[in-house]
Amino acid sequence: MSSSNQNLAIAANAIDITAPESTIPNKSKVPNKSAESSQSTVPKAPSRREIRAQAQAFIDTLAPLQHTNSQKVYLEGSSADIRVGMRQILQTDTLVGGTDDAPIMEKNPPIRVYDCAGPYSDPEADINVRLGLVKLRQNWILARKDTEQLPCATSDFTQQRLADDGLDHLRFEAGSSAIVRPRRALQGKRVSQLHYARQGIITPEMEYVAIRENMALAEVQDEILNRKAKGEAFGALVGEPITAEFVRAEVARGRAIIPLNINHPEAEPMIIGRNFLVKVNANIGNSAVTSSIEEEVEKLVWSTRWGADTVMDLSTGRYIHETREWIIRNSPVPIGTVPIYQALEKVNGVAEDLTWEVFRDTLIEQAEQGVDYFTIHAGVLLRYVPMTAKRVTGIVSRGGSIMAKWCLSHHKENFLYSHFREICELCVAYDVSLSLGDGMRPGSIADANDAAQFAELETLGELVKIAWEYDVQTIIEGPGHIPMQLIKENMDKQLAHCGEAPFYTLGPQITDIAPGYDHFTSGIGAAMIAWYGCAMLCYVTPKEHLGLPNKQDVKQGLIAYKIAAHAADVAKGHPSAQIRDNALAKARFEFRWEDQYNLGLDPETARAYHDESLPQESAKVAHFCSMCGPKFCSMKITQDVRAYAAGLEAAQTKAEQVEAAAQAMQVTIKTPQELEAAMALKSAQFAASGAEIYQVIDKHVKDKLVAEAEEA
């Protein structure tokens, strides 16, 4: 899933990941331009050289990094090699009574949350990007005995790259003679998770997914944490804990996919489907003018830290092949690509010169490297292109426009459509999933839900059924720019035409008036369509339609989309979704500031915002914030509640005290004048008692109040 400028494409000129120190700028040699820019109020952007140096330093010093007060924990499955990593957020205790010298504290349980960072959040992990991550799934793949290791890569292009000595300094495992040898299904075998699921086999990957989706729900015993409102799932099957059998059944039905190429054993199993947690994709990649391999590895790690469930490498520069190898070997999440981008590079950017042979070799090249899913724009048919003529924004999908131009220049049917069965045969040999691209998606709300968009959607529905014939896991891509009132129609039509295959959308963006804030405008649409049933959301950054995003833009886009995905999970009634909300709400009510930060999606920003206005250490435990101050904080009533509870007589229950107080207030009012007098009396009594909302009422006070009320 990509947009015309969403490619995080950031540089590719000569990208030596093992570059000598001389390639990193020496601060003493950098000209001092402060005098020249002293009048400017705009901070000077770092140079390309500085950005690359920063990225080089990042990967040279890369070590596991965990959020404050969080731990990496593992839950074991049925065998010791099924270890599912999660992030455990530790909480502080709650004050429930006692005195300053002898406080009575109540333990708050740790909260376990989904963790996309893999080894990058495990302090015990040994991280070395030049060696790649541990091959988590290697033994599972070998145990099935349905694949073979090839003597060498079979792609013509890969062989050409390997024969080019000038690229040695760029290769993964640079300086080593070791070459990653790909695997492929044995002749006549199918090795997809869909194939196994249809055979009734629960794979280790399926068991892993079930444990991961539940997030240790069974261990949560706290009544407050387990509270949740009834969800509205629009026909989705949520609300019960996930089992491995349920995962198998959903994959077998085609309603979910587990995108895991057999040549990407480093990836941790995850699932995409509307009956599971909503997932978020982030885009990275180099281009002909910006970025380096170092930067792309840095962005990969950064994206997983902030919650990217999958990452798409949308590289378009000279070193696509080498960049992708580094990314895959260091990625704990599935990697997707748009193969037509690289195929276009191979024909020097001339769409008319594309051929099936060039594209097929590109698929083999990427499948043997370990790409987990391909976006294929096979639904852009020749007869659909004229339907876009009256659009405000025409064809905005890069892949869609490439194939539209090819179709028109040759006046032939899209070769991706014509050769779709061959594509499926190739994919199932590596368990590469297909993401059927929406080349006709609208690029403005003025073009939403038009004939071209829905004609392509119907074709994608035909193609998904063909893919299922070959046991190829498949998802459907969707828009785009859709106003709020038209979003549900998109989801309904996708479910109807595509057999409930998972939906994967870019947004949708619900208005076109906010450049610079499209992570908001699209995040709203993303939350809505995810609630209606969309399984995965492709993030949008603040730079959408404006430029290439930097690291902070990537973080902003991911946070916006994690909010959208989580909001949909809560609305659908996913069994474990609301636990984190409840924990944070309880921490907020109890003024446990550090827990509030740590339970949030972005602890760093939350902490910084609080400290910006109240930086003193005492403010870290204060029972107010700068919004209302100590006198007007609505949540300060928690102190009154505690005082009320502590002052109750030991012989009586809280319920008895409330009932006694209620009975004491029952007086007979006969006239408006009596009512006014009684209200005035109660006002005076409230002020005289200290003007506290919650007060202790013992028997003597009760009797006095009753007497005063009767006298009045």
From Swiss-Prot:
Entry's EC annotation: 4.1.99.17
UniProt catalytic activity: 5-amino-1-(5-phospho-beta-D-ribosyl)imidazole + S-adenosyl-L-methionine = 4-amino-2-methyl-5-(phosphooxymethyl)pyrimidine + CO + 5'-deoxyadenosine + formate + L-methionine + 3 H(+)
Cellular component aspect of the GO annotation: cytosol
Positions with biased composition (Polar residues): 20-42
An annotated GO BP: thiamine biosynthetic process
Source superkingdom: Bacteria
Protein name per UniProt: Phosphomethylpyrimidine synthase
Matching PANTHER family: PHOSPHOMETHYLPYRIMIDINE SYNTHASE, CHLOROPLASTIC (PTHR30557:SF1), THIAMINE BIOSYNTHESIS PROTEIN THIC (PTHR30557)
Quaternary context: Homodimer.
Chain residues that bind [4Fe-4S] cluster: C625, C628, C633
Protein keywords: 4Fe-4S, Iron, Iron-sulfur, Lyase, Metal-binding, S-adenosyl-L-methionine, Thiamine biosynthesis, Zinc
Cofactor note: Binds 1 [4Fe-4S] cluster per subunit. The cluster is coordinated with 3 cysteines and an exchangeable S-adenosyl-L-methionine.
Function: Catalyzes the synthesis of the hydroxymethylpyrimidine phosphate (HMP-P) moiety of thiamine from aminoimidazole ribotide (AIR) in a radical S-adenosyl-L-methionine (SAM)-dependent reaction.
Region entry Disordered, spans: 14-49
Listed pathway(s): Cofactor biosynthesis; thiamine diphosphate biosynthesis
Binding-site positions, substrate: N283, M312, Y341, H377, S397, R398, G399, D438, G439, M440, R441, E477, Y504
Cofactor dependency: [4Fe-4S] cluster
Family (UniProt): Belongs to the ThiC family.
Record-listed Zn(2+) binding positions: H481, H545
An example Gene Ontology molecular-function term: 4 iron, 4 sulfur cluster binding
InterPro entries, per database record: ThiC, ThiC-associated_dom, ThiC/Bza_core_dom, ThiC/BzaA/B
Enzyme class: lyase
